[in-house]
Amino acid sequence: MSRLIVVSNRVSAPTDPAAGSAGGLAMALSAALRKYDGLWFGWSGETVDHWTGEVKIEDRAGVTVGLVDLEAQDVDEYYNGYANKTLWPLFHHRIDLAQYERSYGEGYERVNRRFAEVLAPLIQPDDVIWVHDYHMIPMARDLRRLGIRNRIGFFLHTPWPARQLLVTLPHHRRLVESMFDFDLIGFHTREWSDLFTDYVVSEAQGELFGHGGLECFGRRVQTGVFPIGIDVDGFLAARNSTLGARTYDRMAASAAFRSMIVGVDRLDYSKGLEERLLGYEQFLHDNASMRGEVFLLQVTPISRDDVDSYQDIRSRLDALAGRINGAFADMDWQPIRYLNRTYRRDQLAGIYRAARVGLVTPLRDGMNLVAKEYVAAQNPDDPGVLILSRFAGAAEPVSYTHLTLPTIPLV
């Protein structure tokens, strides 16, 4: 049987699946890797003074992982730089925040090349290689240059940008050309697949063939739409676990007969958090009778704190949450509970079940599994309501929610 090799920036295989703290994607990939006796390869999250190329092989709850340390310069140029200051804002239609530094691009190319050089000796002839996300776009090209002829697939977890925006990226053609060393490229939605096709055909003079096939740069690649889901049974088990039930009871008691609105988002300018809080402020201003009757629980773990734009959004959100609470709170009621911390999966399931409204209102987002987890957590006899941005990947195939424009205040 062929092995599965997963390649991603960070290895998210849980050390203890029973703990319930891992995300749904990590749990699903770990299950597939256990089934196919696979390997999960990526950055360890650690830095070293000098690149060694040493790979540490570990077992995490039955999943074999291969971990590589990076130099501090690699982290600064490849991860904080090109991945998160250049590609991330561009792919989320924020070219005003995108930073184009030559050293960032050089670091991105260098780290992908180094990863390929370390991974190549571990690959067996029948292995299937599955590369994940924008950090690793050139990976197939670098593996092919080392003589790897295995099947290699790529899945993009973010949106793909419109052609008119992508061309603002220096060497955009080189980036897209490197993707034609994959055999299969997957997207969450038809929209993003179509945008990729539009670039290839209109900008690079490529041609369509068959169903989802593209020919360009002297090579052929197959594209497909594969909207990621959640493990519903696993999430229900988390909701019904001891901690999940205890969290639900705790939140129900804490609400004190008030209706809870919940938002759970990593701190990121793409999530529409400022617009969400401003909309909630407008809602309280326009609906005085609802003051004291509802509250917003906004769970927002800090991320990418080394990037200036993330420091800026954090400061603005801190100030905005404080302003709203200062303006509307009473001695026994606080309109916003704003928390910069993480919670375990079973705790989140309990929180979702207790919330009467779930807010998932990004300005531009990948699939956003919070939307699906919120729905899965509901009591089918008395479900809450999901308000979902039209610009989340989860909005494309659904009919179970209220779609909204995240830039329009709640009314």
Question: What are the language-model segments listed below?
Answer:
Residues 349-366, 375-376, 381-383, 391-393:
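Acidic donor-binding loop of glycosyltransferase active sites
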Residues 213-222, 237-261, 288-291:
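Nucleotide-sugar donor-binding and catalytic loop/hinge architecture
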Residues 75-128, 243-250, 254-256, 337-346:
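Conserved nucleotide-sugar donor-binding subdomain of glycosyltransferases
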Residues 300-346:
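Nucleotide-activated donor-binding/catalytic signature segment of Leloir-type glycosyltransferases, i.e.
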Residues 255-270, 296-297:
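Conserved donor-binding/catalytic core segment of Leloir-type glycosyltransferases
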Residues 1-73:
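N-terminal low-complexity, Ser/Thr- and acidic-residue-enriched intrinsically disordered segments
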